[in-house]
Amino acid sequence: SVTPKLAFHLLSVVKFEDYLRLQQSLVADLAAGGDCIKVLICEHTMELTVGRKGSHAHIRIPQTEREKQNLQTHWLPRGGGAILHSPGQLAVYPLVPLQWYGWSPGRVLTMVRDAVSMALSQVGIATLCYDGLHSVWGRTGMLAATGISVQQNVSCFGSYINVSPAMGLFGYVDTAWQLPADQSRRTMSSLMAEN
């Protein structure tokens, strides 16, 4: 077993299209033989992303409101559904050269979810994780959504942790496309609401 090498990069608020260009460049570097897991941490401007499990039906923000907010929508080849991004939500992107470490995409997905859950417990937030699901739930609802993809044998994308975003539009985006048995509603929440 190889001991992972990690490099953390703290970015600021980044437009999603700018992040995608950066991710593409880093994936190419890692695919060319890199052995270091690069973890990018940032916030995004208010934008929507939709993964492979998402659809137009998961976005119920009226078109007039989307235009008023200048809300861009990006259809992505990552797992998961629709996610609303905004400042106050922490995006954590572990770019892992899978072949170097011998990890499967499923293992990385579970590791990311578990790392988020452990980090939140370290700051006093009780979390719930469910077998077969990769979101992190708290007392008040879903706290973090996770979705990855693999490009050139490197994991991309990651987890989105709601720390203190303005929650107004979150109710119009169905991020929780699959609900755990003991969660009765598709509620996105935040770490601030947990306190």
What are these regions (language model features)?
Residues 1-138, 142-143:
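N-terminal lobe of the biotin/lipoate ligase/transferase fold
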Residues 23, 41, 158, 188-191:
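A residue-level signal for conserved active-site and pocket-lining positions in enzyme catalytic cores
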Residues 57-65, 71-72, 143-173:
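Short, conserved beta-strand/beta-arch hydrophobic-aromatic motifs that form part
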Residues 109-113, 163, 184:
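A structural signal for well-ordered alpha-helical scaffolds and beta->alpha junctions
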Residues 168-195:
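A hydrophobic, small-residue-rich beta->alpha segment in the mid-to-C-terminal subdomain
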